[in-house]
Amino acid sequence: MRIHYLLFSFLLVLLSPLSAFSKKVYNAVSCMTNGGICWLKCSGTFREIGSCGTRQLKCCKKK
């Protein structure tokens, strides 16, 4: 039964980096790394995933 605890902890360690993708982007380099573009306003085919360092610039990514 102890192997179940080991496998469960191993699974948690493997899946924990996946939660990092749900965090907002706050600078232009992170925006481009995540496949986004810095624009003033996201158009209809794009969704906002964060900001590019200022309040005016939004990091937009295709839906």
Swiss-Prot record:
Q: Which residues form a coiled coil?
A: none
Q: Name one GO biological process term.
A: cell chemotaxis
Per UniProt, what is one GO molecular function of this protein? Answer: CCR6 chemokine receptor binding
Proregion span(s): 21-22
Q: Which cysteines are joined by disulfide bonds?
A: C31-C59, C38-C52, C42-C60
What the record says about family reads:
Belongs to the beta-defensin family.
- Function, in words: Has bactericidal activity.
Q: What is this protein called?
A: Beta-defensin 3
Q: Which organism is it from?
A: Rattus norvegicus
Q: Name the lineage.
A: Eukaryota, Metazoa, Chordata, Craniata, Vertebrata
